[in-house]
Amino acid sequence: MTSTAYSRPSKLPGGGNGSDRRLPPRLMRGLTTKIEPKKLGVGLLAGCCLALLTYVSLAKLFAIYSPVFASTANTSALMQNSPPSSPETGPIPPQETAAGAGNNDSTVDPVDLPEDKSLVEAQPQEPGFPSAESQEPGLPAALSRKEDDAERAAAAAASEIKQSEKKNGVAAGGDTKIKCDENGVDEGFPYARPSVCELYGDVRVSPKQKTIYVVNPSGAGGFDENGEKRLRPYARKDDFLLPGVVEVTIKSVPSEAAAPKCTKQHAVPAVVFSVAGYTDNFFHDMTDAMIPLFLTTAHLKGEVQILITNYKPWWVQKYTPLLRKLSNYDVINFDEDAGVHCFPQGYLGLYRDRDLIISPHPTRNPRNYTMVDYNRFLRDALELRRDRPSVLGEEPGMRPRMLIISRAGTRKLLNLEEVAAAATELGFNVTVAEAGADVPAFAALVNSADVLLAVHGAGLTNQIFLPAEAVVVQIVPWGNMDWMATNFYGQPARDMQLRYVEYYVGEEETSLKHNYSRDHMVFKDPKALHAQGWQTLAATIMKQDVEVNLTRFRPILLQALDRLQQ
């Protein structure tokens, strides 16, 4: 009997000639007898399975990971293939963690996983996020086809730092960590690497005993046989000055019982430093105290307790606006306080760089602060309005403002009035002033200027208050002063995005010609005086006054005007 499933009419609907007819039923039966229905059904089933398998494979390859539809088992498997969290990268992002049992919150709590160094080094990318170069968006970093070279390098650098810390006596027992930079050398500026220690864990500060206790069961950290380390926390490594700095002891104790009891608990880090040395000089107030304090604590955003030794009430009063910007808490007098202050972290000493300069450095400046950042900090702390100089021609009759800083001691500009008159004649609105103890008031005056002019000396430090792109004119005294002029004020001005102009005084423009013959070393070989040290230099070259030749100096004023319009 012929199967009806495969039978067809012998003619097309509507009839037709013989050429339009289908194959006769007999021929169709001949074909169907060669293909059995059961075998055809098995073949179709196998084909469907193959197509389904291919679809599933391709879907797995191009699927986008979704924490909403991922099961707990899949999420656990994903975390096994991803690098664990570390203190540097923070906890695992929420999409890589499973919700805790009984947690009705819609968010997923982060989970800290034990650190596996082999995985961290092999997979330096952020866990759970695709590489920027990945060709498969949405896949976790552990499954990406390409690795991020920059993060691999960062992981390698972090590993090197950890190994270096182990070699240099960094203690890490439980929550305790002690890291000191005591033997750093800057060949050009040896004073630019003072001793600094960072302390983490149970840190107890006893000002009365001039001691910082650290609960350190391991005893590691480079301490002497008594478990002590002594520092003079002044931010200038100057052998002449350091004997006058209060010495503070860091004492490692094995347990809480061996440390004095806390009289006050603090939830923020402490920073202990000295304002001894040259800190009654504005240049040194900045280079040896305020800039190092900014470099050490700015990242804490006010959440730090300042303790000052060699305490000077007038100094604290003078810089109160800056200290309050760096710390939300009243300064503690380390010389008189009788309590025991307990902190989770502490700094003894301050990090610093060269004078009026902040450069990138892996330990001293890991956050890559610059002098531009410090200038911005000053403007915020002192509420200085201007961050750019005047635009010439913007308003009819507007004249650029020049501030000439006068000096009462040495290195006076003897013909200051003539210089001011020449500048006025060229179109400047000139103000002459001497820096005083009222820092906010004088900072506002400097900030209002477009051009600052001064003879080499501490007064030029006030360039830190100028708006960016203002002009600094330094009159450099006679006596091979180019190195000091460039490194103390010229390069810092450029780093602060100021426009710098300098004028070198000749033999006929210095008052030294009245005190020494032209055959004296002052004129014949001033470099030899520098080689004899600061005391000799201070007694000779630094005592001069200057009287500039207006014919020579006028082009400098024109250059300042031109630089202001660039």
Curated annotation (Swiss-Prot):
GO process annotations (BP): plant-type cell wall organization
Disruption phenotype: Dwarf phenotype, decreased levels of xylose, ferulic acid and coumaric acid in leaves, and increased saccharification efficiency.
Residue spans, topological domain Lumenal: 65-566
Cytoplasmic topological intervals: 1-43
Listed Pfam families: Glyco_transf_61
Assigned keywords, A-Z: Cell wall biogenesis/degradation, Glycoprotein, Glycosyltransferase, Golgi apparatus, Membrane, Signal-anchor, Transferase, Transmembrane, Transmembrane helix
Subcellular location per the Swiss-Prot or TrEMBL entry: Golgi apparatus membrane
Residues the record marks as carrying a glycan: 74, 104, 368, 429, 515, 549
Tissue specificity field: Highly expressed in young panicles.
Enzyme class at the top of the EC tree: transferase
GO CC field: Golgi membrane
Feature: compositional bias, Pro residues: 84-94
GO molecular function: UDP-xylosyltransferase activity
EC code: 2.4.2.-
Superkingdom classification of source: Eukaryota
Region annotation Disordered: where it falls in the sequence: 1-25, 78-180
Main location: Golgi
Pathway, per record: Glycan metabolism
Membrane topology, record value: Single-pass type II membrane protein
TM annotation in the entry: 44-64
Family indicated by similarity: Belongs to the glycosyltransferase 61 family.
Function as written in the Swiss-Prot or TrEMBL entry: Glycosyltransferase involved in the xylosylation of xylan, the major hemicellulose (non-cellulosic component) of primary and secondary walls of angiosperms. Possesses beta-1,2-xylosyltransferase activity, transferring xylose from UDP-xylose to the xylan backbone.
Record protein name field: Beta-1,2-xylosyltransferease XAX1
Organism: Oryza sativa subsp. japonica (Rice)
Source organism phylogeny: Eukaryota, Viridiplantae, Streptophyta, Embryophyta, Tracheophyta
Gene name per UniProt: XAX1
